[in-house]
């Protein structure tokens, strides 16, 4: 059961109740939490487009706590982050793993952060196939293309060589927030609204 808290805001015109996510959106904050899939991606994309249309000169704050998920859904968010004019500040809270690590590293350079005890995990995409041999071969080739694309993005975002990223994503590669900064996936560690 997913309960969404409600907040009450008082103004000169009276009281107004918001679900917490709508209230955060007023402050240009988007929460990306849980597995990345089509419905979530559509919601994140819509929020990014709305905030950019509202005022493209102000930053959008994308807080991420996700184990990753469907690559095509994540790429819809990634492409939108790069399409809009607003700078997108990314902040890892908890974990940004798999596709979520690609998103957190794709924030505006200089504005990619992690909280002190957050974790970033990079690895190769996973997938499966069944059916005729030719269908399995097509699926395997698609996974290899996807892996190359993800590794190219991680290399571009981190400043690491493609070969280094390819080696590091061979298996699950966990990084603390500071290690993610050292690797180039993040720009700083946030602590009590201050950067380390």
Swiss-Prot record:
User: What GO molecular function annotations does the UniProt record carry, in alphabetical order?
Assistant: ATP-dependent peptidase activity; ATPase binding; serine-type endopeptidase activity
Q: Which GO terms describe its cellular component?
A: cytoplasm; endopeptidase Clp complex
Q: What is its EC number?
A: 3.4.21.92
Per its UniProt record, what InterPro entries does this chain match?
ClpP, ClpP/crotonase-like_dom_sf, ClpP/TepA, ClpP_His_AS, ClpP_Ser_AS
Q: Which UniProt keywords apply?
A: Cytoplasm, Hydrolase, Protease, Serine protease
Q: Which reactions appear under catalytic activity for this entry?
A: Hydrolysis of proteins to small peptides in the presence of ATP and magnesium. alpha-casein is the usual test substrate. In the absence of ATP, only oligopeptides shorter than five residues are hydrolyzed (such as succinyl-Leu-Tyr-|-NHMec, and Leu-Tyr-Leu-|-Tyr-Trp, in which cleavage of the -Tyr-|-Leu- and -Tyr-|-Trp bonds also occurs)
Q: Which SUPFAM superfamilies does this entry report, sorted A to Z?
A: ClpP/crotonase (SSF52096)
- Tell me which Pfam families the record gives: CLP_protease
As for what it does, the entry says:
Cleaves peptides in various proteins in a process that requires ATP hydrolysis. Has a chymotrypsin-like activity. Plays a major role in the degradation of misfolded proteins.
Q: How does it assemble?
A: Fourteen ClpP subunits assemble into 2 heptameric rings which stack back to back to give a disk-like structure with a central cavity, resembling the structure of eukaryotic proteasomes.
Q: What is the name listed in the Swiss-Prot or TrEMBL entry for this protein?
A: ATP-dependent Clp protease proteolytic subunit
Organism equals Limosilactobacillus fermentum (strain NBRC 3956 / LMG 18251) (Lactobacillus fermentum)
The upper taxonomy is: Bacteria, Bacillati, Bacillota, Bacilli, Lactobacillales
């Amino acid at each position: 059961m997913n309960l969404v808290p409600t907040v009450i805001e008082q103004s000169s015109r009276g009281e107004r109740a918001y679900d917490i996510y709508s209230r955060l959106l007023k402050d240009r904050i988007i929460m990306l939490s849980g597995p990345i899939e089509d419905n979530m991606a559509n919601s994140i994309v819509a929020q990014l487009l709305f905030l950019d249309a509202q005022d493209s000169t102000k930053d959008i704050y994308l807080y991420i706590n996700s184990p990753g998920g469907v690559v095509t859904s994540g790429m819809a968010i990634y492409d939108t982050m790069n399409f809009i004019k607003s700078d997108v500040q990314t902040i890892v809270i908890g974990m940004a793993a798999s596709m979520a690590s690609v998103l957190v590293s794709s924030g505006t350079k200089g504005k990619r952060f992690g909280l002190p005890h957050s974790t970033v995990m990079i690895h190769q995409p996973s997938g499966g196939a069944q059916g005729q041999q030719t269908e399995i071969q097509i699926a395997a080739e698609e996974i290899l293309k996807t892996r190359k694309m993800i590794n190219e993005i991680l290399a571009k975002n981190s400043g690491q060589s493609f070969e280094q990223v390819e080696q590091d994503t061979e298996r699950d590669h966990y990084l603390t927030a500071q290690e993610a900064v050292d690797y180039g996936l993040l720009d700083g560690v946030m602590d009590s609204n201050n950067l380390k």
